[in-house]
Amino acid sequence: MAEEHVVYIGKKPVMNYVLAVITQFNEGAKEVSIRARGRAISRAVDVAEIVRNRFLPEVRVKEIKIGTEELPTADGRTANTSTIEIILEKP
């Protein structure tokens, strides 16, 4: 999957990300990846569900990947942060 079909979830309102996913599909993408880490994971799940249930019912979840990243902290240690990638597919 090309890197341009990835939506990174942050602190913006959920509907901003929903619009980004819908735009990707409308531009011809067959798959769109939604990626988030930490507290944004629940927002990523919300985005995927809103896209599927409200706007594009033909879209399905192809794959969900979860993992952990080690991020450096301000005091020089490392902190584990959870990650998720939800891949949506349009038939």
From Swiss-Prot:
Q: Which residues carry this modification: N6-acetyllysine?
A: 11
Q: Give one GO molecular function term.
A: double-stranded DNA binding
Its keywords, alphabetically, are:
Acetylation, Chromosome, Cytoplasm, DNA-binding
Q: Name one GO cellular component term.
A: cytoplasm
As for subcellular location, the record says:
Cytoplasm; Chromosome
PTM annotation: Acetylated. Acetylation at Lys-11 decreases DNA-binding affinity.
InterPro entries membership: Alba-like_dom_sf (IPR036882), DNA/RNA-bd_Alba (IPR013795), DNA/RNA-bd_Alba-like (IPR002775)
Q: Name one Pfam family in it.
A: Alba
Its function, per the record, reads:
Binds double-stranded DNA tightly but without sequence specificity. Incubation with DNA in vitro gives fibrous structures 10.3 +/- 1.1 nm in thickness (naked DNA is 1.83 +/- 0.37 nm). This protein does not significantly compact DNA.
Family under the similarity heading? Belongs to the histone-like Alba family.
Indicate what this protein is called per its UniProt record: DNA/RNA-binding protein Alba
| Organism of derivation | Thermococcus kodakarensis (strain ATCC BAA-918 / JCM 12380 / KOD1)
